[in-house]
């Protein structure tokens, strides 16, 4: 039930076209931009690596694409525990390669690829950008409260919140 709580498809704006370009990737593009080569943001949803979907970040992706300045691709990467590490990360790396390989048909400027995400999605975005396969292919990162460490570092935050449910 928790996994499906944030999985309802969102209502999209009238300024954006959406379509599934693969079984696990949704493209958001500004209406009327189909022939323009635009930068792209590959967005990875949060959810503790165990829940969430491309629907849980749909409204955000739609709003970014509605700005008219970029295409956004949301990825439905494989979730733990059914798909242990590094399967989700492998999906992210494969998505970057897909974007590059299909840039012409998607009207994407391969010199302006951004990868981003929130929470665990931010972690995957950072790990993807740092991967040997993707290093040098990604221009920028858009990270919202990314998980960058998960160990007792002695900080006040860890002392106060380090026990119990982490996410």
Cite the ranges covered by each PLM segment:
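Alpha/beta-hydrolase superfamily serine-hydrolase fold, recognizing
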Residues: 8, 13-167
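N-terminal targeting or regulatory segments adjacent to alpha/beta-hydrolase or S9 domains
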Residues: 1-8
């Amino acid at each position: 039930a928790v996994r499906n709580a944030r999985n309802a498809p969102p209502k999209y704006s009238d300024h954006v076209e959406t379509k599934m370009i693969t079984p696990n990737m949704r493209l958001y593009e500004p209406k009327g931009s189909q022939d323009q080569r635009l930068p792209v943001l590959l967005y990875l949803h949060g959810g503790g690596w165990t829940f969430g979907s491309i629907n849980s970040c749909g409204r955000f992706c739609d709003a970014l694409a509605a700005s008219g300045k970029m295409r956004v691709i949301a990825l439905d990467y494989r979730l733990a525990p059914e798909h242990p590490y590094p399967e989700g990360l492998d999906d992210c790396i494969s998505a970057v390669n897909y974007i590059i390989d299909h840039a012409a048909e998607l009207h994407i400027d391969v010199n302006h690829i951004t990868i981003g995400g929130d929470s665990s999605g931010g972690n995957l975005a950072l790990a993807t950008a740092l991967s040997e396969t993707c290093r040098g292919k990604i221009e920028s990162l858009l990270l919202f409260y990314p998980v960058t460490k998960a160990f007792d570092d002695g900080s006040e935050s860890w002392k106060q919140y380090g026990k119990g449910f982490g996410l």
